[in-house]
Design a protein with these regions (language model features):
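Glycine/proline-enriched, intrinsically flexible loops and inter-domain linkers
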Residues: 2-282, 286
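N-terminal low-complexity segments that are often proline-rich with Ser/Thr-Pro
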Residues: 288-290
Length: 290
């Protein structure tokens, strides 16, 4: 007898048990609770038209602004590849490693050589468990000799990193800080960011950092993104106080460039060959091997 979970090549007779179905709508109403965090940009995303969201890093994550009847995700895509867009990516929680042994600890937990990352620069980083499984793939920012920020993807990296140093072998503080990023992505992003941060912004290299202020609020800017387009991230310090200042400043400056607030553009990410951690990776090397 043919197993119903072993379909034919064309998948036309595929049957997936209910307990394995990860896609599709949930036929229940989900309750809002303090177990899932609302970011400092959450209400601003709603004002911008956010109509659907998911949960990422235990934070509500906007995933759509243009409704299907108005063109949906392809309208957002058009704005991204032709003009400039702003994304609420506060779900990229910021884990700070600071102290005399910050470089040594960071070098221990990532797979690349942290000693080669100069202050004022960032790198894409991978963190693995003792079996070689991928735990997280943050953008790693080195602000100073003794301070690194891990801009993390979706996993409890803070607890893992604190656990790695439970013996206090490394003289560092490991904590989550009140910093939330926005992404500014698209071919006109450099012009918009130069208007906000000054012409020196144009000298920031790929994965380079710039510390400045916008509207009186302190920020760190990196030339990074999730699209393959030219783009930047604005890391807002003291985000719960300064989120509206930065958001509104970007909206105002962006009018000239046709700025649109959109959701993270996975269609463009796929075109660019950029992986999304835990969609294509796993803490279990066996999952990747199979």
């Amino acid at each position: 007898m043919k197993n119903p979970n072993h379909p034919s090549v064309d998948q036309s007779d595929r049957v997936v048990p209910y307990n394995l179905r990860q896609s599709g709508r949930t036929p229940t109403e989900l309750l809002i609770s303090t177990r899932v965090r609302k970011s400092p940009f959450w209400h601003l995303s709603h004002e911008a038209g956010c109509w659907r969201a998911t949960v990422y890093n235990r934070i509500y994550h906007p995933r759509g602004y243009v409704r299907p009847e108005d063109g949906g995700a392809m309208v957002e895509y058009e704005a991204l590849v032709n003009r400039v867009t702003m994304w609420n990516v506060a779900v990229e929680r910021q884990i700070r490693v600071k102290g005399p042994d910050a470089e040594a600890f960071t070098d221990y937990v990532i797979t690349r050589d942290a000693t080669k990352i100069e202050p004022g620069n960032g790198k894409y980083a991978i963190l693995c468990n003792d079996k070689g499984g991928i735990l997280n793939d943050p953008v790693l920012l080195r602000l100073t000799e003794d301070e690194f920020w891990f801009s993390i993807s979706d996993s409890d990296l803070l607890l893992w990193m604190q656990g790695v140093n439970i013996s206090k072998k490394y003289d560092v503080e490991i904590d989550e800080i009140d910093v939330c990023p926005l992404q500014i992505q698209g071919p006109l992003s450099e012009d918009l960011m130069a208007k906000l941060a000054g012409e020196e912004l144009r000298d920031v290299p790929y994965y380079g950092l710039m510390e400045t202020s916008i509207g009186g609020a302190d920020v760190v800017i990196s030339q990074t993104g999730f699209t393959g387009e030219k783009g930047y991230e604005i890391y807002v310090r003291d985000a719960h106080e300064n989120a509206e200042i930065i958001w509104n400043a970007v909206l105002e400056a962006g009018k000239e460039f046709g700025l649109m607030v959109i959701a993270p553009a996975h269609h463009r990410r796929i075109q660019a060959g950029i992986l999304s951690c835990l969609l294509y990776t796993s803490p279990s090397p066996r999952d990747v091997e199979e």
